[in-house]
């Protein structure tokens, strides 16, 4: 057993249990879902998980204190665990104790975190390393390292730049592009999108108010070609569309909105005049 890799896995939130990773991808069984369509109501079904990694690694699913099956005991209080540093410390101490208790100090050791769990990964990795616990690898799932990229703060171009390839990939998946673009493979199309983002879109945003109308219209036309969203909309948005705006605008004419967590999903846009969708389609 000492030679088998061991993976400590947790979701994010903060405040989420590890249920989602456990029953979605990591465990021996997974919930049957109807991706990319809605999953029917109960009874819910289980099936063998063909993507489980238990054939080559042991997996420890961790519920942070106060989530899932983890509870405080003794005289502990919530503030002892519910903070960035407190969470890192509690997670790290659990891992250290687990490795010693079960004789796994010699095992190849990995962290796997999702969403806020990628924040946790970074802190836990440093905490463990400072105490002599070297890791063999860290796996980031749905990583977010800069919360600015989620909040789209004013006068910050970065969120729009890093989201743009996702906008384009979503449009390609839903066949919102012209024939030339749709006929390209996803890989070739996204390579073109990334090149455009780095060499044209980002420099255009960095010009700020110094960009000329001619330059701005040219970029707006490029954005329409790569996303299917009308160039007039891009122009009116000053070439910057927030994620929620894009997901609501992409298929507005069909009365549909795109999923935020998984943009393959489509939902009913109950009020198409809105800037943002009322619902967030998902399974």
What are these regions (language model features)?
Residues 27-33, 37, 128-228:
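A catalytic-pocket lid/entrance helix-loop region that shapes and gates access to the active site
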Residues 84-101:
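Helix-loop module immediately N-terminal to the HCX5R catalytic loop
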Residues 207-283:
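Alpha/beta-hydrolase fold catalytic core
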Residues 103-116:
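Alpha/beta-hydrolase fold nucleophile elbow
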Residues 123-127:
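Active-site signature of alpha/beta-hydrolase-fold catalytic machinery across serine-
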Residues 1-80:
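N-terminal cap/lid subdomain of alpha/beta-hydrolase-fold enzymes
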Residues 117-122:
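Catalytic nucleophile loop
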């Amino acid at each position: 057993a000492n030679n088998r890799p061991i993976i400590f896995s947790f979701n994010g939130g903060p405040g989420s249990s590890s249920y989602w990773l456990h029953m979605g991808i990591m465990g021996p069984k997974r919930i049957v879902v109807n991706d990319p369509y809605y999953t029917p109501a109960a009874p819910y079904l289980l099936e063998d998980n063909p993507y489980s990694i238990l054939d080559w690694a042991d997996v420890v699913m961790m519920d942070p204190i106060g989530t899932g099956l983890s509870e405080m005991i003794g005289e502990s209080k919530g503030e002892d665990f519910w903070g960035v540093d407190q969470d890192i410390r509690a997670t790290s101490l659990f891992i250290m104790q687990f490795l010693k208790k079960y004789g796994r100090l010699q095992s190849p050791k990995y962290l796997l975190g999702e969403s806020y769990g990628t924040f946790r990964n970074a802190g836990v990795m440093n905490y463990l390393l400072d105490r002599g616990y070297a890791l063999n690898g860290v796996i980031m799932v749905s990583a977010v390292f800069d919360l600015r990229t989620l909040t789209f703060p004013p006068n910050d171009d970065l969120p729009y730049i890093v989201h743009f390839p996702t906008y384009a990939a979503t449009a390609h998946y839903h066949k919102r592009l012209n024939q030339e673009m749709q006929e390209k493979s996803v890989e070739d199309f996204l390579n073109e999108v990334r090149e455009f983002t780095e060499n044209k879109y980002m420099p255009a945003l960095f010009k700020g108010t110094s960009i000329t109308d001619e330059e701005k219209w040219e970029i707006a036309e490029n954005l329409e070609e790569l996303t299917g969203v009308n160039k007039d909309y891009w122009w009116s948005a000053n070439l910057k569309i927030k994620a929620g705006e894009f997901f609501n605008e992409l298929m507005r004419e069909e009365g549909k909105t795109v999923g935020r967590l998984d943009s393959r999903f489509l939902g009913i846009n109950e009020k198409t005049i809105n800037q943002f969708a009322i619902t967030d389609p998902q399974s």
